[in-house]
Amino acid sequence: MTNELKRTPLFEEYAKYGAKTVDFGGWELPVQFSSIKDEHDAVRNRAGLFDVSHMGEILVTGPDALNFLQNLLSNDVSKIATGQAQYTAMCYENGGVVDDLLTYKLADDHYLLCVNAANIEKDYDWMLENQHQYDVTIDNQSDAYAQIALQGPLAEEVLQSLTSTDVSAIKFFRFQENVEVTGHKVLVSRSGYTGEDGFELYGAPEDIKALWGKILDAGQDKGVVPAGLGCRDTLRFEAGLPLYGQELSATISPLEAGIGFAVKLNKEDFIGHDALVAQKENGLPRKLVGIEMIDKGIPRHGYKVFKDGKEIGEVTTGTQLPSSKRNVGHALIDSQFATIGNEMEIEIRGKQLKVVTVETPFYKRSK
């Protein structure tokens, strides 16, 4: 690793657990600790703890905070109450995606945006560029926060053992500020990127650093493990959650990517609104579908998809599922071919191999 890679405040902590690190968008982060499969299974059946301190935090404050965010974001920010989080997209005028993110409402004039690590500067610049006449302060506070995610069916039990706050009262996509966890005050959000129940904890770097070991110690007897980026990707993919740069990008709209639930075309105008309305009215040119290999092989990001010799799209994410060993992927293809059960081909090392479109998500937790 070169010295140029950024490290999170937890780097020294997770190094103690045998982390194998990789360059992830300029950050030196753990791809795995034991193995991707073991960590994936732990999160599905018990719980895993992730360092997600590389994610960005941008604060928006001021009397025009709501109006500014309504213009900036695709979801309807007016619908969330204080203490509630909302998944949304930030779009360009052409409907392409600047980023997908979470909006946390701290107060009527105070919002926290959690953005993707690779997009922090781009998002911040885009927000400043579109501040216009709005009376708001936009503050990139990414360095002031660290963040960990405790994910899995045992997440609530483990977290509850460390705090007197009733965490069962924090419902999905709700959060509570100033929760004291073993003496460390943090924001606790019931949310995540795995398809499981879980919590994301935001706080000062020194507090989150201290909590990393304490949470793992508390969960050790229950089989809770440190988890890396490798299983974070297989978990989110299996659950049908998009990854910016693969399922979403400046050239892929939120409607094409299947996150139309985060786009409210009937609210007041927002950046990208007209382009997305036109897409919906004229029919989406492309759709994201699930694919499964018929022939032997594993679909990978960037592989081209063909129908009767004609290129119709490409794979956005693909892998062998750790749980079921199915060789599956997401592919963005011409809409006319997006019906379930349609056979097509993907090109792997110069060979065209058969795939079929299938239902997604590949995993849905039982409530």
Curated annotation (Swiss-Prot):
A GO biological process held by the record: glycine decarboxylation via glycine cleavage system
- Tell me the superkingdom of the source: Bacteria
EC number from the UniProt entry: 2.1.2.10
Taken from the record, one Pfam family name reads GCV_T_C
Q: Which reaction does it catalyse?
A: N(6)-[(R)-S(8)-aminomethyldihydrolipoyl]-L-lysyl-[protein] + (6S)-5,6,7,8-tetrahydrofolate = N(6)-[(R)-dihydrolipoyl]-L-lysyl-[protein] + (6R)-5,10-methylene-5,6,7,8-tetrahydrofolate + NH4(+)
Listed SUPFAM superfamilies: Aminomethyltransferase beta-barrel domain, Folate-binding domain
User: What InterPro entries has UniProt attached to this entry?
Assistant: GCS_T, GCS_T_bac, GCST_C, GCV_T_N, GcvT/YgfZ/DmdA, GcvT/YgfZ_C, TrmE/GcvT_dom1
Query: Kind of enzyme, top EC level?
Result: transferase
| MF GO annotations | aminomethyltransferase activity; transaminase activity
Q: Name one GO cellular component term.
A: cytosol
Keywords linked to the UniProt accession: Aminotransferase, Transferase
User: Has the keyword Transferase been applied to this entry?
Assistant: yes
Identify the PANTHER family for this entry: AMINOMETHYLTRANSFERASE (PTHR43757), AMINOMETHYLTRANSFERASE, MITOCHONDRIAL (PTHR43757:SF2)
Q: Could you tell me what this protein does?
A: The glycine cleavage system catalyzes the degradation of glycine.
- Tell me, how does this one assemble? The glycine cleavage system is composed of four proteins: P, T, L and H.
Designated name of the protein: Aminomethyltransferase
Q: Which gene encodes it?
A: gcvT
